[in-house]
């Protein structure tokens, strides 16, 4: 699960997204990764741990989770020492970075709806994303020849990804009702995602971290909660504050740079 830049300029050529990662399986696989362990040894162990009967599905799940090596990173330490809320935030803070449809849905659906809902005296159902809006979004993102079954599964998968980070509430069994909401991620999970991005963007302002960073886009916290997360990250050594021309700046902290950031 490496964090690399994603080019959305050609998003309309995407194929469907129908294969999903079982959250419990992913948590189990990462829990059994230890610093110094070879990838081959981890893969062999992971194959034994997964309950799926089919070898092809086990290989697919392992491929979704694996990285190039197992190191004593800040991410692994926080994950294995963390509570369930933190572990889920860390997992999806890495996993969804490389999913263009998640990023696009956040920017085109979730944040515009939150902006409408946060206005004084918002319109009725301002937080609602209507079914036809979902359909237009998915249709614009995928190739025109995607079968209807794959179209429906992709729509469901994107919704599930947004729900996993707390920005979408889904209700109803037949007609799905989807409402946006501000996420409340574990503070250190949020701070880690900010700090990881700061390794590639060496210096940014606190307003950027709270509103424009990938973590802010993904979890969509309110400004006061984002500030709390950043304070927690500084206290834990994931982030470091500095000042430039009387402006507070953020940098990746010493806790990110020892033993490998990822």
Indicate residue ranges for each PLM-predicted region.
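Short amphipathic alpha-helical interaction segments
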Residues: 53-62, 148-164, 219-232
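Eukaryote-skewed repeat-based solenoidal scaffolds used as protein-protein interaction platforms
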Residues: 106-173, 181
